[in-house]
């Protein structure tokens, strides 16, 4: 799953990921995961802009297509990451739109429940909550002035 906001705090969580039936975290080093993968995913949008010299909109469009595909047609029992209003799970404030693992079926989604989170995961999720709440406060201020 990829938790949180699209941006520098985005957190690719491999805790429950598997590769050919093996836990993904058993196939990589902690150093590579923490110091390479997480920062690379978090900076992906800006890296695309820098490499291509223009917007990463095509990448965002592909993500939107995948998002709608899974939502409408289902994710076949597999987890997908979607930005959805939180129901309060995992300490994410209720109503905050947040990327989290879901399973899609019949045009609906259900947040994956009861995952055990370690402190590393909780810290990254908390950083995303702070970033999104800061963005929401900025928007609220702009709207109040309008």
Where are these regions (language model features)?
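Long, compositionally biased stretches enriched for glycine and/or charged residues
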Residues: 1-146
């Amino acid at each position: 799953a990829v938790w949180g906001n699209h941006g520098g705090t985005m957190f690719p969580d491999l805790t429950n990921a598997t590769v050919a039936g093996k836990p993904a975290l058993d196939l990589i080093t902690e150093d590579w995961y923490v110091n390479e993968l997480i920062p690379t995913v978090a900076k992906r949008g800006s890296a695309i802009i820098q490499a291509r010299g223009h917007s990463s909109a095509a990448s965002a469009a592909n993500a939107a297509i995948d998002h709608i595909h899974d939502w409408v047609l289902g994710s076949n029992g597999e987890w997908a990451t979607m930005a959805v209003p939180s129901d309060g799970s995992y300490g994410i404030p209720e109503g905050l739109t947040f990327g989290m693992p879901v399973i899609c079926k019949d045009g609906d989604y259900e947040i994956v429940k009861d995952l055990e989170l370690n402190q590393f995961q909780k810290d990254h999720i908390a950083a995303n909550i702070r970033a999104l709440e800061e963005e929401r406060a900025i928007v609220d201020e702009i709207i109040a002035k309008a």
